[in-house]
Amino acid sequence: MANNRRDRDKGDGSQGEGLSAGGGMPSEPEIVSVTVHPTPTLAVSLKPAQQGDIWASLLESSPWSANHGGRIEPVQPSPAPTRPTESPSVGDLVSRWSQPIWRTPSRVEEVETPESNFVIELEASQPITSDITVSVSDLVIEVQPIQTTEAEPEPELPVAEPEPGVVPVDVVAEAEPEPELPVAEPEPGVVPVDVVAEAEPEPELPVAEPEPEVVPVDVVAEAEPEPELPVAEPEPEVVPVDVVAEAEPEPELPVAEPEPEVVPVDVVAEAEPEPELPVAAPEPEVLPVEVVAEAEPEPELPVAAPEPEVLPVEVVAEAEPEPELPVAAPEPEVVPVDVVAEAEPEPELPVAEPELVHEAAVSEPVAESIEDAVAVPAPATNFGLAELMQAAAAMAPVLASPPSVAPAAKPVREPAKKRKAPPVRKKVATVQDVPVEDLLGGIFGIAGSAVRSVLSLGAGVVGGVVKGGRVIGDNVVAGARRLTGSAEGSCGTCSTSQCDTVGKKK
């Protein structure tokens, strides 16, 4: 019995292969039903047998016994073809001899194992009693593998594929999330049978299985600093607060800018009258103008005398009275001249008519005909010297022609030359850009001159009144004396004229 169990445990190394291939997990037993049919030629010995002899005979004739009494071998599935022996690589050796903690059982390897455990159930057509002796060699064993429902978890095989068993120990710790490395799965079938003795620490494997699950905990710990990054993000939000603080002095800069703008305000106030007369002039030049204006208290004096004094002072000051020139009376004098110039072509018409020479008058002296024909118009009273000069110039070519040159055959009429009227010179008011200072100085000068003229007129009136008062007073005194003289007595030879002269002398 003990030998049979030992041999059954050893088998052909299938269990050891299963342990080595499955990472220490025993393969599930495959149930096989065996029906035993005793042959009709089976001799049944009626010899009483002692209790236990039937079991001894069965064990001795069984193919699993030590003496191999029976020759009948059970029908077993053909073993899988053995792979050619290859020199194991370093990765295979590491995956084989590494600690079982990094290896998980693979159901694929369990399915690929050529051999598995069998549980034989004997069914006899006749009840076997202690009186019946059955020989195993006379039995016909029919092996019918039965697929139980426990063998159906094959679809769960892909779930157990993430096996990092091929990767070395150091690399597996980093490559744990790589479940796509089932390349070295068929290799565990080459493991020798001696590994079975080393499979004793296999019960520790299920305990160590949850350890790889602890590795993701480290990954979670690494993911914990990620929420710390957004915690540092609000810190730059405080930076805009500093920027706002820096932006506060910015309005102060524009406050300093308008300060230089206040200086042009005075210029703008001065520039308001500039649209009227935009010419700029230096301010210090106005001062001598005022001095010159004060030097003109005598408008009645000849103007030529003070002019040379004003010229060296300032030429611009002299240009100020120019606007007063158009106000003078010479302008209406120019108007009639233009009207007379338009009437000039009228006397020229009779001058061109005497040029016609008739045949009947050829024998007459040409000079007389010319003198008779040329009718010199009487100068108009409105003609000026310039108009008379132009009329004389028009008559000069007619008088200069010799008398013998006149044609004798046919009269030749020359086209009358129309002289163009002299262009009417229209006096265009010159617009000058006068600076504000000069304008103000001129205004003040005009006002001062007007005041001075008023004062002079007032002085003249006062003087006249005084003089008239004196004359009137003298006349009154003379009259009073005459009256007093007539009242006292006649003057005799004294006449009134003498009294008047006496009064005047007094």
From Swiss-Prot:
GO terms for cellular component: magnetosome. The keyword Repeat applies. Residues 13-25 have a biased composition (Gly residues). Acidic repeat repeats lie at residues 150-173, 174-197, 198-221, 222-245, 246-269, 270-293, 294-317, 318-341. Induction: Part of the probable 18 gene mamAB operon. One of its GO terms (biological process) is magnetosome assembly. Residues 1-36, 63-93, 405-424 are annotated as: Disordered. Keywords: Biomineralization, Magnetosome, Repeat. Its main location: other. Residues 1-12 have a biased composition (Basic and acidic residues). NCBIfam families: MamJ. Forms homooligomers. Interacts with MamK. This bacteria makes up to 20 cubo-octahedral magnetosomes of about 45 nm in diameter which contain membrane-bound crystals of magnetite (Fe(3)O(4)). Expression of just the minimal mamAB gene cluster (amb0961 to amb0978), including this gene, is sufficient to form a minimal magnetosome chain with small magnetite particles. Regulates the dynamic behavior of MamK filaments; paralog LimJ also promotes MamK turnover. At least one other protein besides MamJ and LimJ is required for MamK turnover. May connect magnetosomes to MamK filaments. Moves from the cell poles towards midcell; movement does not depend on the treadmilling ability of MamK, suggesting MamJ associates and disassociates continuously from the MamK filament. The center of the protein encodes 8.6 repetitions of a Glu-rich sequence. This is Magnetosome-associated protein MamJ. It comes from Paramagnetospirillum magneticum (strain ATCC 700264 / AMB-1).
